[in-house]
Amino acid sequence: IDRIFETGVRLDNFYANSSVSSPSRAALLTGRFPAMVGVPGVIRPSVDQNWGYFDPSAVTMPEVLKNGGYRTALIGKWHLGWESPNLPNERGFDHFHGFLADMMDDYYTHRRQGGNYMYLNDKEIDPKGHATELFTSWSVDYIKKEAKEKNPFFLYLAYNAPHSPLQPPVEWVNKVQERDKSLPVKRARLIALIEHLDYNIGKVIPVSYTHL
């Protein structure tokens, strides 16, 4: 993550006007204040807990890039709508492989309140494995495929981690606890979830450099 900060583009005048998921994503994808595109708060399927509706007329970054000849992909978490016209493939992404909803109740089953929100484009899927590792693997495969076909492409990779639940692979928790046995279990799990995420980002970066 530090390497991305040091070598990438720093948006040092970017404000999402919110500390939560949906508005931040709306701001990132449109370059506008989230409330101006209908997302002042978290988008949820239940009316009494919903705080937004992504304006279908808002122009998104992948739409602009797509018009410029880029292939566009979202791998990972969407959280800007559950139904048409606010599905990833309808908002500028040629390829979607990931999670539609707000959070996972389990990083291995990928369920949210009993529902399955894992999709490959418009098809529900039920992959096996930790979500962070799945998103990494799918991203690596996507980069290699587009590079092989010599397509200019844009990949928006959005992990669920380190969002709760604090569910890193056990071996990563063990590493943290071996370094500092005084850590509370919850703290150790959070550190492990972040380190596991960082490790997986580190698997994507070399592939992108190699194939650009």
Model-derived regions: residue spans:
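Formylglycine-dependent sulfatase
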Residues: I1-L212
